[in-house]
Amino acid sequence: MCKKNILSNIKKKKINLLNFNLKKMINFFIKIGEKKFRAIQITDWIYKKQNIKFDQMSNLNFFLKKKLNNIAVIKIPKCIKKIKSIDGTIKWKFLCNKEFIETIYIPEKKRATLCISSQVGCQLKCNFCATGQLGYKRNLLVSEIIGQIWYVINKIKKYNSKKKNFPPIKNIVMMGMGEPLLNLKNIIIAIDIILGNYGFNFSKNKVTLSTSGIVPAINKIAGKIDISLAVSLHASNNTIRNKIMPINKIYNIQLLLESIKNYLKKSSANKGIVTIEYVMLSKINDFQHHAIELSNLLKNIPCKINLIPWNPIKNSSYICSSSKNIINFANFLRKKGFIVIIRKNRGSDIQAACGQLIA
């Protein structure tokens, strides 16, 4: 296709450059008759200088600025609401093409974690999760995934320029709305931008993808994406997992554990350790025999276990395990040699905690 036809096609709908990693950005600039170094300049402006306005990019000439303004845009999701928890957690609500998503900023003393969404809603229907109750609407575009990070980083810098003390984002977790591995194509591109020197330049050890267990996708990314992996297990046997996580009827625990082993063989992120997530549900999965089953399941898998006190959601009959039961569960696993963390409850007063996102 000649350059003229490409430009005429592009004019019909402006292309959002935030959907491109560096490779795709280079291809775009070559197709419109520009040198590939222009792609490096643009990504530098977007991610290093936090500027998305072509007219303010001082190393672009007048004619290139005019061309880009005619055919392209750098567009992030529109933030329509910000809510702050009593514990400092912040929830941002974004408008993405008439749909809503949520992003969570979780500050500690010297660093913060950003929890981002990958889909509008979720099709997995885990019955202890508000997002699962919402149902699935669509996958997020790369620009909508990356835009969450760009927006919050930009906001934190602005807050701190006014002498407000917001710790910088050091960790990215894909634990927001949706199942990342069911939006695999866009997630792969987004991860490239998150890790790339040209992009946000996060360490692979500081980026975590959380999955409910899409076994073929875990096997597919093994050796191709080297970031920390977290797996939402939430049960010690198939009977319980079938009831609370319908995906288990397709990919059961045994298949899931094999895919985890395969991933870890090909990953060096997080020292080759997977994070196992386990929501604590009273009288469902929190008895000692469940802890025994869990320890037997995981004895040959390098892992740390996150025990997650269940956060209340509407239209659910579940009850969170008592603090005593959670501590006893954790101590049993620790005696078996596991690293166990009881996750802190952050942002539950603004429905920003694990399992509460519903936009």
Swiss-Prot record:
The keyword S-adenosyl-L-methionine applies. [4Fe-4S] cluster binds at C122, C126, C129. The keyword Secreted does not apply. GO terms for molecular function: 4 iron, 4 sulfur cluster binding; metal ion binding; rRNA (adenine(2503)-C2-)-methyltransferase activity; rRNA binding; tRNA (adenine(37)-C2)-methyltransferase activity; tRNA binding. It comes from the Bacteria. GO terms for cellular component: cytoplasm. Keywords: 4Fe-4S, Cytoplasm, Disulfide bond, Iron, Iron-sulfur, Metal-binding, Methyltransferase, rRNA processing, S-adenosyl-L-methionine, Transferase, tRNA processing. Residues 108-351 form the Radical SAM core domain. InterPro entries: Aldolase_TIM, Methyltransferase_A, RlmN_N, RNA_MTrfase_RlmN, rRNA_lsu_MTrfase_RlmN/Cfr, rSAM. The active site is at E102 (proton acceptor), C354 (s-methylcysteine intermediate). Pfam families: Radical_SAM, RlmN_N. One of its GO terms (biological process) is tRNA methylation. S-adenosyl-L-methionine binds at G178, E179, S210, S232, L233, H234, N311. It is found in: Cytoplasm. Its main location: cytoplasm. It catalyses: adenosine(2503) in 23S rRNA + 2 reduced [2Fe-2S]-[ferredoxin] + 2 S-adenosyl-L-methionine = 2-methyladenosine(2503) in 23S rRNA + 5'-deoxyadenosine + L-methionine + 2 oxidized [2Fe-2S]-[ferredoxin] + S-adenosyl-L-homocysteine; adenosine(37) in tRNA + 2 reduced [2Fe-2S]-[ferredoxin] + 2 S-adenosyl-L-methionine = 2-methyladenosine(37) in tRNA + 5'-deoxyadenosine + L-methionine + 2 oxidized [2Fe-2S]-[ferredoxin] + S-adenosyl-L-homocysteine. Disulfide bonds join C115-C354. Reaction proceeds by a ping-pong mechanism involving intermediate methylation of a conserved cysteine residue. Belongs to the radical SAM superfamily. RlmN family. Specifically methylates position 2 of adenine 2503 in 23S rRNA and position 2 of adenine 37 in tRNAs. m2A2503 modification seems to play a crucial role in the proofreading step occurring at the peptidyl transferase center and thus would serve to optimize ribosomal fidelity. This is Dual-specificity RNA methyltransferase RlmN.
